[in-house]
């Protein structure tokens, strides 16, 4: 989980949930995260489908050089994005909820959480330095 700070807004946080996986349960999990955020009264964008990637490979059936009998396999990785915009404390509580109490999350679905904190503009114009 990475946190980057941007100078705009007033003490708000935008959290992006990047989901990717090979399972057909991925859209269900993305909808469930968005639904839980909307029930909590959090401004939500998504779930947005992102471009999927596919990998294909061919394997010989026999251990010898028989080119007539081969198996072909394909693996598709689907991706979804859900974003929430909320005050810092609410966003932190929702991220903790998603990480701990949102079952069932499949073992084939990976969730990456990216947070962006918007600082008050008064901090930008004061003598404080933001690193």
UniProtKB/Swiss-Prot annotation:
One Gene Ontology MF term: structural constituent of ribosome
GO cellular component: mitochondrion; small ribosomal subunit
InterPro entries, per the entry: Ribosomal_uS10, Ribosomal_uS10_dom, Ribosomal_uS10_dom_sf
Localization, UniProt: Mitochondrion
Keyword Ribosomal protein among UniProt keywords: yes
SMART domains: Ribosomal_S10
One GO BP annotation of this record: translation
Annotated keywords: Mitochondrion, Ribonucleoprotein, Ribosomal protein
Record's protein name: Small ribosomal subunit protein uS10m
Family listed: Belongs to the universal ribosomal protein uS10 family.
Top-level taxon of the source organism: Eukaryota
Predominant cellular place of this UniProt entry's protein: mitochondrion
